[in-house]
Amino acid sequence: MRLKRFLLRYFPPGIILEYEKGGELKTKAIDLLELSPTTDVDLVVEEIQKAEPLITASRTQQVKQLILRLQEKIGQQDSRQFYLFKVLRAHILPLTNVAFNKSGSSFITGSYDRTCKVWDTASGEELHTLEGHRNVVYAIQFNNPYGDKIATGSFDKTCKLWSAETGKCYHTFRGHTAEIVCLAFNPQSTLIATGSMDTTAKLWDIQSGEEALTLSGHAAEIISLSFNTTGDRLITGSFDHTVSVWEIPSGRRIHTLIGHRGEISSAQFNWDCSLIATASMDKSCKLWDSLNGKCVATLTGHEDEVLDVTFDSTGQLVATASADGTARVYSASSRKCLAKLEGHEGEISKICFNAQGNRILTASSDKTSRLWNPHTGECLQVLKGHTDEIFSCAFNYEGNTIITGSKDNTCRIWR
């Protein structure tokens, strides 16, 4: 084994080793999820060298410099205010979802008008209209980090795969017997998972365009699904009050997470795949040990349905959004509520962190989106201007651009 080079990963902090083994180029990641501006760097370097034979004494200084760079990035204070850059009269009918590519150079909007549109973020110009679905385009995603493909899931029961560069349709995946409402690419960008109102999830092979697996076992609609960071697990959240954990590529169901007393609205893995967070209409969020499928915490406090849940990029914070008009931030390790985000005058349907983990963005039926400090719960900015409910919002990876999608048929770019 021979170390070729180091690559830095800012969020979540880590160093990627590129090395040669038996003539093949391979990579492995050293996660530094606990790194903070006050961490003793020499100690971290020492621990890395003990654990990683590829990093020899001659590389010590280099590794130290990399960690100092990560530390500097984490410590950067962000007092940015966002301003409205463009209003895109995106579709003739309401939007369903918005999503960025990894670099944030382009984003996509899905709509009830049966299309998905690709936009250039810098100019606000429309690049492509992806046409071909025969009903609402509901679930949309880029194959990040690559960003060269787009998947669309529709109420017409099909999923389509498109070229992000040309807008050409590569495949139409047929097999579901009801609406597709959620989808995800695996991290390797070799599979697409789709979740449907027909109670099943399906996996599709991107290369061949064939169905690879059907995951059956839920007793009601699948409303949420996501892969873990390595792509060997998939979770599906259902209206049957449960979440299933599936082994990929075998399709074996490893665990059924039972305990919620209402429909699941969202289910997510944390970065190191040790925890699963689930949000439910029973007003609670639960944390589960992903290895044994046991519930390790029930995060309470909301007075109405929990509509969304998300981890920050390191997996140390959990944020929930509720129909009670508040959001909450919990510590994943202590399970305590760290901050209550109060100020919206309507339900919050969407919540997300920026990649840096120092900002939270919420979308609400009160026609505003808000920016928050996750540690103090302080509202830093209210993004006003939409004339109807905002149900989708996203940060780009750099954290310097925001998109919001509303029932007013427009999409707004803020930066």
From Swiss-Prot:
Q: Which UniProt keywords apply?
A: Cell projection, Cilium, Cytoplasm, Cytoskeleton, Flagellum, Repeat, WD repeat
Q: WD repeats at which positions?
A: 90-129, 132-174, 175-214, 217-256, 259-298, 301-340, 343-384, 386-415
Q: Which GO biological process annotations does it have?
A: intraciliary transport; outer dynein arm assembly
Which InterPro entries does the entry link to?
A: G-protein_beta_WD-40_rep, WD40/YVTN_repeat-like_dom_sf, WD40_repeat_CS, WD40_repeat_dom_sf, WD40_rpt
Q: Where is the signal peptide?
A: none
Keyword Signal in record: no
Main localisation, per the record?
cytoplasm
SUPFAM superfamilies for the chain: WD40 repeat-like (SSF50978)
Tell me any Pfam family this protein matches. WD40
Q: One GO cellular component term, please give it.
A: cilium
Which CDD domains does its entry note? WD40
Its localization reads: Cytoplasm, Cytoskeleton, Flagellum basal body; Cytoplasm, Cytoskeleton, Flagellum axoneme
Family assignment? Answer: Belongs to the WD repeat WDR69 family.
* Purpose: Required for axonemal dynein assembly and ciliary motility in ciliated organs, including Kupffer's vesicle, during embryogenesis. Facilitates the onset of robust cilia motility during development.
Q: What is this protein called?
A: Dynein assembly factor with WD repeat domains 1
Q: Which organism is it from?
A: Xenopus tropicalis (Western clawed frog)
